[in-house]
Each structure stands twice: as structure tokens, then as C-alpha cells.
Regions:
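Short, small-residue-biased leader/transition segments that mark boundaries at the very start
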Residues: 1-7
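Conserved RecA-like ASCE ATPase "motif II neighborhood" in helicase/translocase motors
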Residues: 127-186
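Phosphate-binding P-loop
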Residues: 42-50, 78-79
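Walker A/P-loop NTP-binding motif
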Residues: 66-78
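Conserved nucleotide-state-sensing and coupling region of NTP-binding domains
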Residues: 87-143
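N-terminal pre-P-loop "Q-motif" helix
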Residues: 30-45
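Walker A/P-loop
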Residues: 48-68
Length: 204
């Protein structure tokens, strides 16, 4: 699996067409911008990455960092991801975000044709599931106890925080400090020792 752009074009054409909302007709094909490719290469090439990606609204930050990039890492000849955690403003929000990657693993026939059945025989439920190759996926809400962020002895090695804040939180300085402390202490502390990609995405 050569590049993130290759896996995107090969396995996710349904994300790459802009359609007319009324007629459903294809208006144009959506291509990666250079910053998408640079970000993906940075994530892949830095096993202990700690990064914030701030892109304008509508620039597919969640699509890339929550779906394309982790699946690209997962399907490398030498697997580069073992335990992914998606963190949202609530557990429900995180579960919805994680549901996109779960749907691709379960129903994407191009992935299944090339990499085999992905739905594991073990637990396969909304918000927490394990793929057939053993990669674990978990949704986590803001402020949630990190004690659940383990799979036996395994720790997360890909944590992505997606739109953690909201208007109510931003108006309360103490809560902002509390969540900042939770991110720095609980989430950082949950990462696999010595390695692990920690990514935050948000709007400019």
C-alpha cells in the first residue's frame, strides 16, 4: 500500500465524488491537496508523533485522520497500527466518528477483496470492536476514565481527538483547564510506552 492517496483512490471512491444534492449527479472528483499528502506522510513516518492538524472547515480532516490514514497504516505490509482510539466531545460523538471506519471495515467490498473479511469473530459493537487481524478500535468521550483504554496488555498507539470542544466548554475557563489536564495526563499516559501517534484535529 504505497501512499495514503493510493488507498484513498483504490478503496474509497465513494468519498471522492461531489454530487448535486438535488439530482445526485456527479459534479466533479475530489482530489487530495498537497497538505493532505504531507500530513499523511508525516503521520506514517513518525511513530511517536504528537501533532495538531488545523484545517479549514470542509477540508476533510476527519475523513483523513479518522478513516483514510489509520486504515492506510493498518494495511501496510508491516502493520503500523494496533489499537486506535477516537476521542470526541461525548462518547456518543466518538462512537459516531468511529462508526465510519467500522462501516468501511464491515462493508467495503474492495477492502474485503484485497485484505479479506475484516469483521472479527470477537466483539463487534458500536464504539468498540476488533478487526479480524487483531487491530482494536475504541470510542472515548471527553473526560472519560482512561482505565478502559487497554486491550489486555496492549495500549493505544493511535489516538485521534476530533472536535473535542463546544461553545459551552469554551465559555468556562475552569472546564477548559480541566480538559487540557485530562488530555495531557490521562490520554498521553494511555499511549503505548515509547511509541504511539497522538493527533488532534480541529477547524481553523
Amino acid at each position: 500500500v504505497g501512499s495514503e492517496m493510493c488507498i484513498r483512490d483504490s478503496y474509497f471512491p465513494h468519498f471522492l465524488t461531489l454530487r448535486d444534492k438535488t439530482t445526485g449527479e456527479v459534479i466533479r472528483t475530489i482530489h487530495n491537496a498537497p497538505f493532505h499528502n504531507a500530513a499523511a506522510a508525516k503521520v506514517k513516518g513518525t511513530p511517536n508523533l504528537k501533532a495538531v492538524f488545523m484545517w479549514p472547515r470542509g477540508h476533510a480532516k476527519s475523513t483523513h485522520m479518522d478513516i483514510f490514514v489509520p486504515l492506510w497504516l493498518m494495511f501496510q505490509p508491516k502493520r503500523l497500527i494496533n489499537f486506535m482510539v477516537v476521542v470526541g466531545k461525548s462518547e456518543d460523538s466518538a462512537t459516531r466518528l468511529l462508526g465510519d471506519i467500522q462501516a468501511e471495515l464491515e462493508h467495503n467490498q474492495r477492502i474485503i477483496a484485497d485484505f479479506g473479511k475484516q469483521q472479527g469473530n470477537a466483539s463487534w459493537q458500536d464504539g468498540e470492536f476488533k478487526a479480524a487481524n487483531g487491530v482494536k478500535f475504541l470510542a472515548c468521550g471527553r473526560g472519560q476514565s482512561p482505565r478502559g483504554l487497554r486491550d489486555r496488555e496492549a495500549r493505544p498507539d493511535y489516538i485521534v481527538i476530533d472536535d473535542l470542544d463546544d461553545d459551552e466548554l469554551c465559555r468556562n475557563e475552569k472546564r477548559v483547564h480541566d480538559i487540557t489536564d485530562w488530555v495531557k495526563e490521562a490520554l498521553f499516559g494511555a499511549l503505548d510506552v515509547g511509541r504511539g501517534r497522538f493527533i488532534m484535529v480541529g477547524n481553523l
